A protein has these predicted regions:
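A compositional/structural signature for long, glycine/proline-rich flexible linkers
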Residues: 1-189
Length: 189
């Protein structure tokens, strides 16, 4: 599940898994594992995780484990063991039916239903062209402008990226700033 933490934290919960093997690695947008709930790491008990984005300030409700994502978006890849029989599939499906993701403001309510956010049908680039062609069509300024926007609130650079961010700043690629291609002479552009 892809999760947008831009508006508020999300609560991820799963039931007691009994003796069933399961794994829920959780990734930031940069793709390192930031938490890994599962049989080996957290045991079989039911759990609730409060997934928070960058800069979130608040109180973690009792009984929840906070998972701090350094990026606005994160990913959970759930895996639950099944032995391949119909009977076991039914047992797995019953467990999966209890996996839940809810905004923190709606956690604990019984009448909450998910309404997907509107999808932007025009992200400003082709969704069908090859990635290389999309990048070329953006042009130098467009590419570095997009990079600066993405490194702003959605996926701020990690502290360990400071050396490369400092080098990029020397040529004008800075998180949250528009790229000034005009600062370079024509030969450099």
């Amino acid at each position: 599940a892809w999760i947008d933490l831009g508006k508020e934290p999300t609560v991820f919960s799963h039931p007691d898994m009994g003796s069933r093997y399961y794994l829920f690695p959780m990734y930031s947008l940069w793709m390192p594992v930031i938490e890994s709930a599962g049989t080996r790491t957290t045991g079989e008990k039911a759990e609730k995780f409060l997934l928070t984005g960058p800069g979130w300030q608040g109180t973690v409700p009792a009984g929840m484990t906070q998972v701090k994502s350094p990026t606005r978006y994160m990913l959970i890849l759930g895996r639950t063991y099944a032995d391949g029989t119909e009977q076991d599939y039914e047992a797995v499906n019953a467990l999966q039916g209890q996996f839940a993701l809810r905004p923190l403001s709606q956690f604990g309510t019984h009448d909450w239903t998910f309404t997907p956010p509107p999808v932007n049908p025009d992200p400003g680039f082709s969704m069908t062209d090859k990635p290389q062609d999309v990048i070329v069509k953006l042009g130098t300024k467009g590419y570095f402008d997009m990079m600066g926007r993405l490194m702003c609130k959605d996926a701020p650079p990690a502290p360990e990226d400071a050396p490369i961010i400092a080098k990029m700043a020397k040529i004008g690629v800075v998180p949250c700033k528009e790229f000034d291609l005009a600062r370079f002479d024509p030969a450099t552009r």
